[in-house]
Every structure is written in structure tokens, then in C-alpha cells.
Amino acid sequence: MEKEATPQQQPPVVDPARLKQLNLAIETLEKQFGKGAIMRLGDDSAVMHVQVISTGSMALDYALGVGGLPRGRVTEIYGPESSGKTTLALHAIAEAQKNGGIAALVDAEHAFDPTYARKLGVDINALLVSQPESGEQALSIVETLVRSGAVDIIVIDSVAALVPQAELEGEMGDSVVGLQARLMSQALRKLTGAISKSSSVCLFINQLRDKIGVMYGSPETTTGGKALKFYSSVRLDIRKIAQIKDGEELVGNRTKVKVVKNKVAPPFKTAEFDILYGEGISVLGELIDLAVEFGIIKKSGAWFSYGTEKLGQGRENVKKLLKEDETLRNTIRQQVRDMLTGAPTA
């Protein structure tokens, strides 16, 4: 016997009197706290799509699942010294500026190098830079910039350098246990709400420390307490995995980034790319790696080929060819992007 088709369930009818009371309550809340203080998730005004700023690395944008660093969220980049944390942040600043965005750098370490930033594509003349004297001043500047709603990306370099005022005013050797953690916890409680209402990317750079007496598990931890781990929507762990040499000369590092936390897409994905000294992320090197991975460029031994055309022997020679041949470079880049986004290739 054929089963009878069950009639499609209609949504329950809400009592008009209750609906009227609800609408009055929503109007009152919007008058008191502004439009968007409360909304139905199905309304057009409720933003469902995550807006992003590119990291400057196609592989990392893909690993993040949404195409870049999410706007209106807190992101943390951490790793050992000289692993590429600031380089990655400067690339994100450059990408924001390329699209007409405003970028700010809160340089708590007082170590910003404008010459290097310019080489990575950062517009130094348009970049807002602050070198605060204390952690409270730095986080107050961040809050003001976020609440302005005019800044696209704010980078704080770094959490470890956000020294509380009480520590600065004290003597060397004074006990300051938990001061920075309390400062970060208080600041992030205030900041996250403001950031979510803005379209800013708030990017904290953090350092690693070793926990004493850890026998099992990783002894590594980040500075500034647990608040940043909790409030971050995205956490990126960046590490050097190999050195890049040109003959005997050291020219860069092979870098691996792991997405250890992601609230906007599935986490635990990884991306690998080259960071070259004085140049930053090697866009051509990454393009070749992704093209080989997706089978767009074929690799046989040391030889690389595209279709029936031999590109050259060795990765460095292929990079030189792609640098000179703009048409071929753009064709391969578009095919790689299509593979990353799932679009059909031509």
C-alpha cells in the first residue's frame, strides 16, 4: 500500500495580541539602544554573510573557510619569535588598504619598521600608527577607533608589550601577578560588543611563553591570561618549519599556519607558504604550490609543465617565468581561485 502524503506543516499562528506586545517591546528597545539592538534572524537587516579582509595568502584565506579574517570579530595570531606574525598582520593591512580601507597599527612594542612595511605593500602615508606608553592607553585607543566605525583593521602588536600602568609606576622586582590578565579581561569585555557592531577586524599579535612544571601536554602558553583565547573568534598558530636557501645564502622561511580556533568556519585547517626576507609572503611560490596541488601545473621530477607547455626545471625558474609572463600568471591564478572557491574552471 502506498503511504499517504503527509500534509506540510504550517507554522504555528502567533496570537495577534502577543505579537503586538512584542513589536511594542522591540520598538522600545530600538529607541533606547538604537536600531539593530534586537532583530529577527530572518530579517534582511540581520547580517548572515561574514565579511572578511584577505590575509594576503590564498592558502590561508582558504584554510579560514570564509576567505580571510572576519570583520566584526577578534582575531589572535601567535607563535615563536621571528615566525612571521607581524609580517602576516602587515599583509592583512596592505590588503585592506588595496580595497580602499583604513588601517591602524597600535605598536606597543615600539618596533615598527616603515621601510619593511612599504615593501609588503602597506601605504605608509595612510597608515594610522600609535605607540602608546601603557596597556591602558593602548586599549583605550583601540576602543575609540573601533567605536568610530571608520577603521577597517586594527592591529595590536603585541599583547606581551601591553604593560599595565601600575607596573610602569612600580619598582623593578615588584610583584605584578595577574595585572595584565585583569587588564585584558576588562578591556575585551568592553571591546567585543563594540567590535561586533562595527566592520573592523581587531587583530591581536601574541607571543609564546613556557609554563613551568608541565610534564604532560604542551608547555607553551600565550601571554595576557585566558580572556583573549575566549573572546577570539579566530586563533592562528604560525611557525617556521624550514629554511629557504639560494645556494648557501638564507633567503627566507617555509611557514605553516594552523587555524586552532574558528567560530565562523570549521577549524584545524592548515596553510603553508614561503616568507622571503625583505619581501614577505611569496605570492608566486604559493601560486605554484597550489597549482601543483590541484593538478593545474604538472610536476615530473624537477620539471614543471602547464598543459603541453614546459614551464621550466626547478621551482625558482618557474617563479621567474611567471613573474615575467603576466598573461600566464593571471590564467593560472584564476584557475587556482576557481578550485579554492569551488567554481567551475573554464
From Swiss-Prot:
Keyword flag Lyase: no
Keywords noted in UniProt: ATP-binding, Cytoplasm, DNA damage, DNA recombination, DNA repair, DNA-binding, Nucleotide-binding, SOS response
Domain of life of the organism encoding this protein: Bacteria
Listed InterPro entries: AAA+_ATPase, DNA_recomb/repair_RecA, DNA_recomb/repair_RecA_CS, P-loop_NTPase, RecA-like_C, RecA-like_N, RecA_ATP-bd, RecA_C_sf
Pfam families attached to this UniProt entry: RecA, RecA_C
Cell compartments where the protein resides: Cytoplasm
SMART domains documented for this protein: AAA
Any one GO CC term of the record: cytosol
One GO BP: DNA recombination
Gene3D superfamilies reported in the protein's UniProt record: P-loop containing nucleotide triphosphate hydrolases
Residues that hold ATP according to the record: 79-86
CDD domains linked to this entry: RecA
GO MF annotations, alphabetized: ATP binding; ATP hydrolysis activity; ATP-dependent DNA damage sensor activity; damaged DNA binding; single-stranded DNA binding
Family: Belongs to the RecA family.
Function, as annotated: Can catalyze the hydrolysis of ATP in the presence of single-stranded DNA, the ATP-dependent uptake of single-stranded DNA by duplex DNA, and the ATP-dependent hybridization of homologous single-stranded DNAs. It interacts with LexA causing its activation and leading to its autocatalytic cleavage.
Protein name: Protein RecA
Species classification: Bacteria, Pseudomonadati, Chlorobiota, Chlorobiia, Chlorobiales
Gene name linked to the record: recA
